[in-house]
Amino acid sequence: MFDLSLENCRVDRDLTVNIGVDDGKIVQISRGRIDASEKIDLKGYFVLPGLIDAHVHFRDPGLEYKEDFRTGSMAAAHGGFSTVLDMPNTVPPADNAAEFERKIRIGERKSVVDFGLHAGFRSVSDVKGILRFMPASFKVFMDLTGISTVDGLFRELKDLSAPVPVTVHCENRDVVMKSMKELKDRSDPSAYALARPPLAEEVSVAEVLALSIHHEHPVHICHLSTVKALQLVEPFREYVTCEVTPHHLLLDSGAFRRFGTMVKTNPPLRPPESRIYPEFLDRINIIGTDHAPHGIEEKRKGIWDAPPGIPNLEVVLKLLLTLVSKGRMSLSTIRRMLAEEPARIFGLRSKGRIAEGMDADFTVIDLKETGRIRSDEFYSKAHYTPFEGFSYTGGPVMTIVRGRAVMRDGEVLEGNGRYIPAEHDGKHGSA
């Protein structure tokens, strides 16, 4: 007898099955009866593999007043995510073996959902030590560092025969600094978008592509925000994957007039003529929330002083399911971009698919649920969103991590999140 049977699971348009779970793993998928000590009837719902957010900032350690691993992971569970990958820019950053290991211990102590970690990059001397902990990637910010420094990371990974991808924030530092200097006397929110123009992103993408091709090493480009940047990436899919965020997908630079600094983010929201739309999703690998919470008083500062970032974990699935209800995307696209591809790109071999032998991670959704997005219902410490009041159709009703429900009907329950080491096989480009 198994631990758990999930019954009447609609896992595809025309396929309903029962799923047996034992010791946190999927052990049987059948249309027949499954004996289990606990049964959950999911008739009327749609069951996806547990969703994976490959781009979150939980601010822990050092900036816990913004978010920490407990509140961030609760927000993830509330939003329908069973696994997250946290970025390294904490205080201190996770850019050496000691701090990387410390962050693992923090997550294991606090997290409700499973998690992996992106490593920061400080110097080539730290790379080998971090590799022992099997990071999801090494993250670099091109707006903060030079091309020669990043080239050193590529060389070190190649010398160590380590197929760990380099994840990149693409904005050219020189273009940004020049533009900001020219616009520093303006105080209107729209000036920020002009200070980090599409050219900064596109030049940086081209530089990173050159490094990836030269070293024959995998690269993942975060939060693409312009069509031209996407066009640059497309011919080089052997080594390069890419991501879009919900705010770049659903908002444009006109949102500055309504929301001001609440929508300040890097890269900034783009004009309608250059932004990425849902119709482009078949050309992009994953959707990452870039969940980047801050204190509300920080976000109310002036355009040059307010920190960039938008909290998205608890809204993205509702927003995407609303697009599904309008025929602008499909459930199979959600499954690909928020489960299958993040697991493949970042080496989460036991995640991302509903199949025997995989972790028993599931996101259960009600396609008929309707409502309005309310930030006062968030589990995140960041109780604000530019999507406040948006009407939605479809939402998560249960999040299951290794056979354990960590969210039911909007209530987050106790969890036992684990660190998931990444197992990279070097097959990084588009599947």
UniProtKB/Swiss-Prot annotation:
Substrate binds at H57, F58, R59, N89, H294, P308, G309. Disulfide bonds: none annotated. It comes from the Archaea. CDD domains: DHOase_IIb (cd01318). Its EC number is 3.5.2.3. GO terms for molecular function: allantoinase activity; dihydroorotase activity; zinc ion binding. Coiled coil: none annotated. GO terms for biological process: 'de novo' UMP biosynthetic process; purine nucleobase catabolic process. The modification N6-carboxylysine is found at K139. SUPFAM superfamilies: Composite domain of metallo-dependent hydrolases, Metallo-dependent hydrolases. Zn(2+) 2 binds at K139, H169, H223. Pathway: Pyrimidine metabolism; UMP biosynthesis via de novo pathway; (S)-dihydroorotate from bicarbonate: step 3/3. It catalyses: (S)-dihydroorotate + H2O = N-carbamoyl-L-aspartate + H(+). Binds 2 Zn(2+) ions per subunit. Keywords: Hydrolase, Metal-binding, Pyrimidine biosynthesis, Zinc. Zn(2+) 1 binds at H55, H57, K139, D290. Its cofactor is Zn(2+). One of its GO terms (cellular component) is cytoplasm. This is Dihydroorotase. The lineage of its organism: Archaea, Methanobacteriati, Methanobacteriota, Methanomada group, Methanobacteria. The gene is pyrC.
